Amino acid sequence: MPTFELLIKGGHVIDAANGVDGIMDVGISGRLVGAVESDIPSSQGRRVIDATGKYVMPGLVDLHAHCTGMDGSFFPDEMCLPYGVTTMVDCGGSGWRTFDDFNLNVVRKSAVRVFALLNIVGQGMEGDVEQNVEDMDAEFTAAKIRQRSDVLVGVKVAHFQGMGWESIDRGVEAARLSGTFCLVDQQAKPSRPFSEMLERLRPGDGTTHCYGYDKPIIGNDGKVKSHYIEARKRGIKFDVGHGGASFSFAMAQPALEQGFPPDTISTDMHRSSLLTSRATMTEVMSKFLAMGMPMAEVVARSTWEPAKWIGHTELGTLTPGAPADITVLEFQDRPAGLSDSGDSGPRILRAEGRLINQMTLRDGVVKFDYDGMAKDDISERPTTDLNLP
C-alpha cells in the first residue's frame, strides 16, 4: 500500500532550512511533508509526479504584497498561486480600524495563507493615504496585533509626507508593544535623512524598496552607503519590495557585487506593478538569478528568510511534518528581457532565461498545475458513465 498520497520524484530540491540542495524525492502525507529522501520507490506514491529537470522548493513566501486597502490591490489566490506563492503578507493595507473587515472578506476566503502587517494608521491605506498623524495610535495598533496574532505579524509605516518622525516613531513603538517588527517604506527628505531613519529602527525592524532609485543605496562614488552597512551590522533587515516604481538595476547590481544582498525577495505586487514591471515572485527571483545570485540563495530569500522574519518557521521549509506547501519551478532557457521600474528608466536586463512556475501545492493539494504534471494523459479512459440517458 502506498505510503504517500503524492510523490514528487527526481527534482532538484532546495530547502535552505535544512541545507538541502540536490536531486531528491519529496513524499507528501495528507497535508504535511512526509519525507525528503534521495530515492523513494515510485511504489510508495499513490500518485507520482516526475519533476526531472525542475526545482522543487517550499512554497514561496511573499513578504510584501497588497490585497486590500488600495486601488489596484488584488484577491490573493489568482495573483499568488500561479506564481508559486503559498504565503503572502499584506503590507499595511489595513489598520486597527479596518482589519476585521479585511480578515472577514479576504483572509478567511483565500486559499493562499495570508498574514498582514498592520498599518500604523488606523484606517490603513484608505483615504488620505497614511498622512493622518492623529490616527497613528501605537497602543491601539499593538492591541489589535496581540488580539489577532494568528494573522498579524508586524507593523507597516509608509508614505508619510510630513516633516517629522511621528509615523516611524509610533510604528516602532507599536512593534515594541506587540513584540513584533516594524517595516518602513519612506523616502529620504532633507528634514528626514535616510541615515537617521535607519538609526531609529531596532534590530529585527527593516525597510522595504531597498533598491529603489529614489532611495539610493549606492552613492555618487558607486559604493554602498556606509549607513546601510552599519544598519545591517545592527540587525536591520532589507526587503526588495519590487513594485511598479521601486526597483532599479542601477542600485541592485552594484549592491550585490559589493556583498549587500537583500534579506528577503518580495514583489510589492498590485495592479500597476504587475502590468508595468511584471512584479511576480518568479519574475523578481529571475532578476536576482540573472544578476548572478546563486539559485539556492534566491530560493532562501524567497522562502526560509521571510518565514523566519514573520516568526513562522513552520513555513518556508520541507522539514518532515511541515505543511506541504510546495512550489515546482522550471528555468525557461530562452532569451528574456527583465525590466526594472521607476525613476531609473525603466531599463531591461537581457538574460539567458527566466523562472516559470509549473506547480503550486498548498497543504498537500495541487492548486496550480501549468503543464498538467499531476494530471492523467488523455489516453487514460475517463471514469464518467457514458451510458447516462
Regions found by a protein language model. Give the residues of each.
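C-terminal cap of metal-dependent C-N hydrolases
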Residues: 11, 323-380
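Di-metal (Zn2+ and/or Mg2+/Mn2+) metal-binding site signature of metallo-dependent hydrolases
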Residues: 54-77
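Alpha-helix-loop-beta-strand connector modules within alpha/beta enzyme cores
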Residues: 57, 106-117, 174-178, 231
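Divalent-metal coordination cores built from histidine and acidic residues
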Residues: 78-159
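Active-site core of metal-dependent hydrolases
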Residues: 154-275
